[in-house]
């Protein structure tokens, strides 16, 4: 059984280097991750991005990208967060 938790726990796990997703997200194969800038980065602070490059869909026009992510209120209040390998 997959461990599920709230966004506070998900945020803590992101800070530990884990990748997280919501069980309730429609797209399978997508997740969020925390990016910490290094000396070669243009960003100066950590940020969360969503990775949709593994999105499993029959829609050939679906975006498969890595872009900055902002949590919705629904995401922040959800209790179906889980980590992936």
Predicted features, each with a name:
Residues 1-61:
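Extended non-catalytic interaction/regulatory regions in multidomain proteins
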Residues 55-85:
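Short, compact, well-ordered microdomains
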